[in-house]
Each structure stands twice: as C-alpha cells, then as structure tokens.
Amino acid sequence: MKVTKSEIVISAVKPEQYPEGGLPEIALAGRSNVGKSSFINSLINRKNLARTSSKPGKTQTLNFYIINDELHFVDVPGYGFAKVSKSEREAWGRMIETYITTREELKAVVQIVDLRHAPSNDDVQMYEFLKYYGIPVIVIATKADKIPKGKWDKHAKVVRQTLNIDPEDELILFSSETKKGKDEAWGAIKKMINR
C-alpha cells in the first residue's frame, strides 16, 4: 500500500475521546520496547510519526493515526513493563480491555513479538485474551534481521508453538531495518479491513 498521508489524530484514554467517522481500525499491541513504533514508521515510510523511545512504557494512551484517510492504526500501550506502578498497569489494562471489547471499528490486532526470543507470559496472555474475545490477530515477529536467515524457521516455530497460534491467524517475520515482511504485513492488514 502506498501511503500518501499519515498523521496522529488523537491520544485517547476514554471511549468518548475515540475518533468518530467509522473508519476501520487496526490496533497494534506488544510488549514495551518490542518495536511497535518502528513497525508503524516502517509501514508508512515515515521516520518519526510514531515516536520511538529507548524508555519502555512510553506510550500511555491509545494513539490513533489516520492513514490515507482510509483507516486508523491504534497504538496500544506496551504491556509487561515492570517499572510502572501496579495501579498504573491496572489502569492501562482497563483502558486496553475497554477499547478491544467495545470498539466496533476494530477489525484486527497486530500483535508484535520479538523473533529472537520465545514469547513471554505477557505475550501469551495477550494472545489468549484476544482469542477469547474472537478478535482476529496478525502476529508480527520483529527483528528478523538480527537472526541468520537459516534460523528463521526454527524461531518462527517457537513463536507459533508458544503462542499456540490459531491456524486462521498469520505469522509474519518482519524487520524495520531491511523492510522484510512489509508487503506481507500490508497484505494481511488489507485482508482484515476488507472482511
């Protein structure tokens, strides 16, 4: 997909702040510092629309980005970050749960994991949570450029088995450095939007 327009619309905390207009939405979820912002920037060919940070837990709101006036990407706060208080984590959890379980415009969630490591318990819980609510998931395994090509299949198998990925859900190996998986990711997103 050729992206000609991309901008942040709103950083929302409550449902009444969500944008109106009925555009399809794709939410992006992942552990803190897994590379969600890099994934967004890489997909839309922008260096810094989604701010990348070396400080995990930076995104604390639902950030809605409009893409080509056709869809919204919704950057969800990173989960599994230990340095925030329990009450903050619970508030994030409620915010994410409210969005995912009530938002009619939500078409799918892109769950981002790190291909170099087996998915964490937080990753597994997130995937199971999405499946419990019947949300389609596209699993993006980032940082593929950090692993020798010959080991991709082995690492992908670990991701698939640890998350127990539903046969209907796609697993795409991705690198924001080399752009590997970018076309496949757009293909999977388009498929979800057109369902």
Swiss-Prot record:
Cellular component aspect of the GO annotation: cytosol
Primary gene name: engB
Protein name: Probable GTP-binding protein EngB
Residue numbers binding GTP: 30-37, 57-61, 75-78, 142-145, 174-176
UniProt KW Cell cycle keyword: yes
Further comment found in the protein's record: Estimated to be present at 1000 copies per cell.
Cofactor(s) recorded in Swiss-Prot or TrEMBL: Mg(2+)
GO MF terms held by the record: GTP binding; metal ion binding
PANTHER family: ENGB-TYPE G DOMAIN-CONTAINING PROTEIN, MSS1/TRME-RELATED GTP-BINDING PROTEIN
Domain (EngB-type G): residue spans on this chain: 22-195
Gene Ontology terms describing biological process: division septum assembly
Keyword Mitochondrion applies: no
Family of this protein: Belongs to the TRAFAC class TrmE-Era-EngA-EngB-Septin-like GTPase superfamily. EngB GTPase family.
Mutant lacking the gene: phenotype: Essential for growth, it cannot be disrupted. In depletion experiments cells become over 3-fold longer, are abnormally curved and nucleoids condense.
Pfam families, per database record: MMR_HSR1 (PF01926)
Keywords: Cell cycle, Cell division, GTP-binding, Magnesium, Metal-binding, Nucleotide-binding, Septation
Residues where Mg(2+) binds: S37, T59
CDD domains hit by this protein: YihA_EngB (cd01876)
Function as written in the Swiss-Prot or TrEMBL entry: Necessary for normal cell division and for the maintenance of normal septation.
